[in-house]
Amino acid sequence: QRLTLTQPAAAALYAGIIGDTGRFLYDLTTAQTHRAAADLLATGIDAPAIGRQEDQFPENVGRLIGWALENVHITTNGAGSLIITQSVLQQFGLQYGEEQRAVGNIGKLASIDRWVVFTERQDGKYRVELRGKTKEINTLAVRHGGGGHPLASGAVADDEAEVQAIEKELASD
């Protein structure tokens, strides 16, 4: 017995697919992913409108992205690192968690093949978000008590010393 898929449900699923696959760019995107998206498109959803909606962000987030691209440190071997402090979040009128859009945008720089974004939490620890275009970074996350997917992982750094250790390890990989 088949379930009926409503357009709102199809639209939500399609938004999830394009988000999770980076608009079908990520390595784990398969033919099955494309078939599922095609089935959702067949329901009559407005894919361009969904794509535009998923691609938009508030002006203050855009300004943070510009700041992030200007301030990311890039090593000669393609490792990028950025620290977003509580004062930076305040400067852009953002709450903790609203800086997420900056993480993926750093990877759009051609000179970077792996990167880390540290976001200072209220308790002084740092959320660690590791990303790689082709180099797996999840083992680095595991070494620091985190985990995740081969090209997208995370952890928590207890202090600035651990932040520096992660930066050094990422640059040496």
Task: Please give the residue ranges for each predicted region.
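A short, charged helix-loop
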Residues: Q1-G16
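Hydrophobic helix-and-loop "lid/oligomerization" segment in the mid-to-C-terminal part
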Residues: Y14, G19-D173
